[in-house]
Every structure is written in structure tokens, then in C-alpha cells.
Amino acid sequence: MFGLIAILVFMSTRETKKYVKDGKKEQPDFAYESLLKDNDGIIVLCYHRVLKDTVVTNFAYSISHNSQLHEYNVFLQDFEQQMTFLKKNHIKVLTSSELIEKLNKKEVIGKAVVITFDDIDKSLPENAYPIMKKLDLPFTQFIITGKVGQTIDGSQMSTWKEIKKMNENPLITSGLHTNDLHYQENFEPILSTNISKKVVQKDYQKSQKAFGEKLDQKGKVFAYPYGAQNKDLEDYMLQDGIQGIFTLSPGVVTNETLYSNIPRLIVTKDNWKTIKHWLLSEGTQ
């Protein structure tokens, strides 16, 4: 039991979107009140792990001062309530392809959401996916292709078999989350460093190769690990036909949003109230 608690306390230490140069982690602001001011727009929700509400996880939460344990994990009960809210209130939930189509046509009118998951650990197929399937809600899963089936900082990644099964659902979109560039050096995401153009291009090629071999398709959307943008990678992906690039820069998608810089909101229990309030104010897609 103590081993499980230790894993839960430390499993989220790699998940952060902003760093300062001296290596000290800068705390991201997930409040969002000041951002949700647009009358029309699409918010892209970002989830990482959806955990069952157990004695072990509750104890880990109560003793941990690691804010990332609270900010990057959502309890299953809370997640189900959030998805049920979207369904019962007839909030339009778009696929990532529908979002990109609206951007291209400048047809972002009213309000809607897109649901995304990063990394794709076991909690998606085991906990979150059954709820999404039951409620008939679309989502996009961003996959670290080189880490599928492995354990990363205490999180057991989903297998290709699990990913493929979800991908067979027409409501599910599979996207790229790099092949093996989801890590940090000196508290800085590797894509934020002076990593060479050759390295990022080769990594992207490996991701696309894995998609072709395992899912029999080409990835059309991409999400930056930690939200760390890289111009060399962006240019290369756009030339290769990537249709949408997602960041972790908070904001609302409007007709002015570039499909190469699509903002997302990391969902927490605390900021969900703000998100709900915005969605229930004027207009829907």
C-alpha cells in the first residue's frame, strides 16, 4: 500500500507546462476566470489521468503538497459528473476534425467543447473511456508512440491493443504526442531546449511510422508535451500535412485562432466551476 501511495505522490512531477531558466518550476495558473470572457468560442479540455476514488488515492492527496498531483489528475467520480453535465445540458462536443473545419471556415459561432487526453495511460481505457462510450461523447487521445505499454514515472501506459480498440470507435481521434520527446532536462521540456531540427524531425517520422504500423492511419493532429512549442517541429509537421497543433497555452478558440496554435484548458476540480459557468452563459454551437 505504501508503495502505491509513493507512486501517486510522485507520478505527476513531470507534468508541468512552464519553467523558468534557473530550473525552479513556475506554478501554472489554472483559474481561467480572466480568460473566459469571449461570448463565442470553443474550449478544448485537457485531461491526463482519471483515477478511481479509493482510500489509497485519497490518502496520497491528503499528505502530498505536490500541486501537480491535484492539477493533472481527476477523480473518476468528478470526471463522470463533468461529462454528464455536458450531455445533460446539450453542450456541443466536437471532434478535433470538426474544430479544425470550423477554424478553416471561420465558423466558430456560439459555444462548444473538444475533449482531449494526453499521454494515454491505463486510466483512459479502464476508467474514462467507458464513460465516454456510454454518453456517446467524442474525444482525441494524444499518444506518446515510443512509450506505449511502458511505465513512465509511476504511470502505466496503455497498450497498442487498448489504443487500437478505442481508435476503432468512430468518435475517437488518435493524435501524436511525440515518439520519445516527452521528457525534461534541467527542469525544461526537451522541445524548449536547443534540440536540433534533425532530432525533432526524426522523432516525428517515428511517430507517424508507428501510427501507420499499429493503427493503419496517419496522424493528423499533434499536441506538444508540456505545451512546449518548437518552431522547427511546427514547420515540419505543417509541411507534412498535420491539420491541427494543440498547446497548453490557456485560452478560448475563436475565428482568429491559428490551427498551428490551438489553446487548451487543463481541467481541475477547482476550475470546473468556472468552465461550467462560461458554457451555460449565452449561446451554443
Predicted regions and their residues:
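Hydrophobic membrane-insertion alpha-helices, especially the h-region
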Residues: 1-11
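Metal-dependent polysaccharide deacetylase catalytic core of the NodB/CE4 family, i.e.
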Residues: 45-52, 110-113, 121-123, 130-230, ...
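Functionally critical loop-and-helix segments that line ligand-binding/catalytic clefts
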Residues: 272-278
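C-terminal domain-boundary segment and adjacent tail
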Residues: 71-105, 212, 234, 238-272, ...
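N-terminal pre-catalytic segment of deacetylase/amide-hydrolase enzymes
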Residues: 10-111, 285
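Short, solvent-exposed loop/turn elements at domain surfaces
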Residues: 52-57, 125, 271-272
